[in-house]
Curated annotation (Swiss-Prot):
The gene is LIP6. This is Secreted triacylglycerol lipase LIP6. Induction: Constitutively expressed regardless of pH conditions or exposure time. GO terms for biological process: lipid catabolic process. Its EC number is 3.1.1.-, 3.1.1.3. It comes from Malassezia furfur (Pityriasis versicolor infection agent). It comes from the Eukaryota. Belongs to the AB hydrolase superfamily. Lipase family. Class Lip subfamily. It is found in: Secreted. Its main location: secreted. Pfam families: LIP (PF03583). The lineage of its organism: Eukaryota, Fungi, Dikarya, Basidiomycota, Ustilaginomycotina.
Length: 385
């Protein structure tokens, strides 16, 4: 594969083959890692016997994977952050995801064909990869028979995302994002390193050696864009070396990076982690450039970032099924508003009540309304640097 600058590189993808496998279709599942530690890569954490401690957020992602595998689809799970564990670097994630698809299609033991249809899906950090897979597929993966791209809670603009995260409960994502972006850009890393304060150096070192939950508990309410972490950090996002990089991490900004297969985007109106309007703007810009985009706004006031992922598992599954079946898809930009994605006739028709019960149990027991249980857990167990 290659880095975001097209330099030669290597990575891994993990392939899951169900017993009832349909050998003519492939799902490219971009799970969120949202961290920079080497042990956070899915190719390691998913393996039996890995030393990685149980991570409840991975369990959330397994709900969709379980449904996809039960439907008989082969699944490929690329380590799209690459060898430098670069969280937040969209173009790199897109290229490595596309090369993961190519490698999987070329893996003869699977009996897939080069033109086997592929559907890509990702949420949150995985939506960074899904969005950039969609954006770069026409140019970098034109040989791939892409049928569609699903993405939810999409960090479509890294500048806006960093500003929303900074100094908030989920500011650890900003720590991991700044670290990942710096390690993917040698010039930025050389510029940033001598400007880090002692606290900033500790934060970068921690982010490079720990995964999502540990970082969340270590760095809530941290001001990364400040003198606290970086000398001159108050103006970090105004520095030319930073703005020149981040301007290339905006979905929909360039007409040459427009998806040609259908795009399904979903986002909670009250998402407390990822900016809603940045994702909406990306979908609108893609459509202005010729893409077909269905943007779903989840309006129920108690849906937070985590709950929005879970309640849309059935809709993502339907999108995958419909793309493989070549069903019709709205042309241009279509905006739908949904109160409760679980309350739909199609969920009832396809007898998904067991899945709905699983989702509701997780939301009630582990997440809570408006992600309250998660937020309280972070506050209660925070270990400040």
């Amino acid at each position: 594969t290659g880095t975001h600058e097209s330099d030669p590189a290597v990575t891994a993808t993990t392939v899951l083959v169900p017993y009832n496998a349909k050998r003519d279709k492939l799902v490219n599942a971009l799970t969120y890692v949202d961290a920079d530690g080497s042990e956070c890569a899915l190719s390691y954490t998913i393996r039996k016997g890995s030393n990685f401690p149980g991570d409840i957020v991975e369990d959330y992602q397994l709900l969709l994977l379980q449904q996809v595998l039960e439907a008989g689809y082969i699944v490929t799970l690329p380590d799209y952050e690459g060898k430098n564990r670069a969280f937040g670097v969209g173009p790199l994630a897109g290229r490595q995801s596309l090369d993961g698809i190519k490698a999987t299609l070329n893996f003869d033991r699977l009996n897939l064909k080069a033109n086997s249809p592929v559907v890509t899906t990702g949420y949150s950090g995985g939506a960074i990869a899904s969005g950039w897979t969609a954006a770069l597929q026409p140019s970098y993966g034109s040989s791939i028979n892409a049928k569609g791209f699903a993405m939810g809670g999409t960090p479509a603009n890294m500048t806006g995302t960093l500003l929303k995260l900074d100094n908030g409960l989920f500011s650890a994502f900003a720590v991991a994002g700044v670290t990942g972006i710096a390690y993917a850009n040698d010039d930025l890393l050389a510029w940033l390193t001598p400007r880090l304060t002692a606290k900033g150096r500790r934060a970068v070192e921690f982010a490079r050696t720990h995964c999502l939950v540990s970082t969340l508990l270590r760095y809530p309410f941290s001001r990364v864009v400040s003198e606290d972490f970086i000398r001159g950090g108050t103006h970090l996002l105004e520095e030319p070396i930073v703005t020149n990089i981040l301007k290339d991490y905006v979905m929909g900004a360039k007409k040459s990076q427009t998806p040609t297969a259908p795009v399904y985007m979903y986002h909670g109106r009250n998402d407390e982690v990822i900016p809603y309007h940045d994702a909406l703007k990306a979908g609108q810009m893609w459509a202005e450039h010729g893409a077909d985009v269905l943007f779903q706004t989840d309006t129920f006031p108690l849906l937070g970032h985590a709950t929005t992922e879970l309640v849309n598992v059935p809709n993502v599954l339907f999108f995958i099924q419909d793309r493989f079946a070549d069903k019709s898809f709205p042309k241009g930009f279509r905006h739908e508003y949904i109160n409760n994605p679980l309350d739909s006739a199609r969920v009832r028709e396809q007898a998904l009540q067991t899945l709905v019960d699983q989702i509701q149990n997780i939301v009630g027991d582990q997440i809570g309304p408006n992600d309250r249980a998660i937020r309280e857990h972070i506050r209660a167990h925070a270990r400040h640097a």
